[in-house]
């Protein structure tokens, strides 16, 4: 199978996904289920397996999804890790912070740089991972409440240990 990547299409997909992610109001301490469900469906449609972990109230959720290696050779997986929450919106916004806005070749929106932009890029590249003969698993690890006290990551780490999921390269 060819590993050639159409960078223009990858860029366009990244912008489309990022625009979608910005539309989810995932301020620290608030519900992020809709964003996680979006990411999970996107990855599962590509053949990934996934599971979620929750806070005690089940209003904030982590996602761990895996695109399995086709030819595993025992090498450590790659973990693409990011957080889904954003800081609260300040009053100085001149546009809707939850609608991606492009001005002078720059995209603006809450979380576009920290860290929904990275998550969008990982999701945009996921179709490539799903089609090539990977020699290692690719994990997608998306957590909640990094902006405040990193509350989501410890919950996910506990579950990873229970499932004996191998650490990897982040």
What are these regions (language model features)?
Residues 115-170:
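Acidic/histidine-rich catalytic neighborhood of metal-dependent amide-processing enzymes
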Residues 2-110, 129-135:
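Acidic/His- and Gly-rich active-site-bordering loop/insert found
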